[in-house]
Design a protein with these regions (language model features):
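C-terminal cap/linker of serine protease catalytic domains
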Residues: 2-26, 187-245, 281, 285-289, ...
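Conserved active-site neighborhood of the chymotrypsin/trypsin-like protease fold
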Residues: 9-13, 41, 53-55, 60-140, ...
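Active-site-proximal beta-strands of protease catalytic cores
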Residues: 33-37, 66-70, 121-134, 167-170, ...
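Gly/Ser-enriched beta-turn/beta-hairpin loop segments
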Residues: 45-50, 95-101, 150-165, 216-223, ...
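Conserved PDZ fold ligand-binding element
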Residues: 63-67, 188, 259-282
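PDZ domains, with a preference for the canonical peptide-binding region formed by the helix
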Residues: 74, 272-301
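Flexible, gly/ser-rich surface segments that form the specificity/activation loops bordering the active-site cleft
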Residues: 114-160, 196-202, 216-221
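PDZ/PDZ-like domain micro-motif
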Residues: 174-179, 236-242, 254-272
Length: 322
């Protein structure tokens, strides 16, 4: 009986710890979270009208820059009204849109404390929190869950987005664009949509994608991407057979110039990009994005079963920059 009581007591302590941490996380971030309303009025109380398709949550990533989802925007002429949880309403202006990641960057004249963005990928099984704006009542909704899976693909706003996180976490309409938070109150992702039409599952974009897109925007004045035209696969079993510690297997090559100039073959393993070891698909995406920031060519180190190690230099101009 005493052991049962001890177990129940320990469980109660765990739940209290989770509850206290959740309260702390939300209190740390709540002032930086806002509602984004696409509106035809003038951003005053009597003019702001809300529909599910035209409202999202957003959060500050800089003192005068808010990030949210781009799928609520029909064109760049749309008027954006920002509504804080303490009732302030002010205008927002679209700075740039990253449709590949369903991101929209909004400039505002009202400064608030930005949230800290993690630039590393969170692991499966991690506990995460979020707070977003509930559509219809414009009040914040708090939710908690776990990261159930990585590298999920989904069609959002008629575009396929890859490398998403699958969350076992309920959300409600209006929460698209809400920050996904870790126990340290740092952003590890952004909610994009509910998954499979069930409220219990959600999809989120990794924070590293947000972090790099914003750095590229600050440097170039717009968000651009490099597309090498390679289809890659994470295959631990293949790496084990080849006695390799890390790498991604090439499963398809759409870029004919890359195929011709580098003699890359299906089955080759990309081990490094610009001196950085590649373990995951997100590592690869990050390394390619960093080449834009560093304004440098791309050097791939590959392993071929026939040729062993080989190098491939890719000039950015020979890749698909968009």
């Amino acid at each position: 009986m005493r052991s049962v009581i001890n177990v129940l007591g320990n469980a109660e302590n765990v739940f209290k710890l989770i509850e206290n941490n959740l309260r702390r996380v939300i209190s740390n971030v709540i002032e930086s979270i806002v509602a984004i309303v696409v509106n035809e009025g003038n951003c005053i109380n009597s003019d702001v009208s809300v529909t599910e398709e035209r409202i999202a949550t957003g959060f500050y990533i800089d003192k005068d820059v808010i990030i949210t989802v781009s799928h609520i925007l029909s064109n760049f002429k749309d008027r954006l009204c920002i509504i804080s949880l303490d009732g302030d309403i002010y205008k927002g202006t679209v700075i740039s849109v990253d449709e590949d990641n369903d991101l929209m960057f909004i400039g505002v004249d009202v400064s608030r404390r930005p949230l800290k963005i993690e630039d590393t990928l969170i692991s499966e099984g991690a506990i995460v929190f979020s707070s977003g704006i509930a559509q219809g009542i414009l009040r914040h909704f708090i939710t908690m869950g776990i990261v159930s899976g990585l590298e999920v693909r989904s069609i959002i706003n008629n575009r396929e987005i890859e490398g998403l996180m699958l969350l076992n976490m309920p959300t409600i309409p209006g929460m698209s664009g809400a920050p996904l938070l870790n126990i340290d109150s740092n952003v590890v992702g952004m909610l994009l949509s509910r998954s499979f039409s069930y409220n219990e599952f959600s999809l989120a974009l990794p924070s590293s994608r947000i972090f790099l897109s914003y750095l590229i925007l600050r440097k170039l004045g717009k968000v651009v991407h490099i597309k090498l035209g390679l289809k890659l696969l994470q295959s631990p079993n293949a790496l084990k057979k080849l006695k390799l510690e890390n790498g991604l297997m090439i499963m398809g090559i759409a870029n004919k110039l890359l195929f011709k100039n580098c003699n890359i073959s299906v089955g080759d393993i990309i081990i490094e990009v610009n001196g950085k070891k590649i373990n995951t698909l997100e590592d690869f995406r990050k390394a390619i994005a960093l080449s834009i920031l560093d304004n440098m060519s791309i050097e791939l180190i590959l392993f071929s079963q026939k040729e062993g190690l080989k190098r491939c230099h890719v000039d950015i101009s020979s890749a698909h920059l968009y």
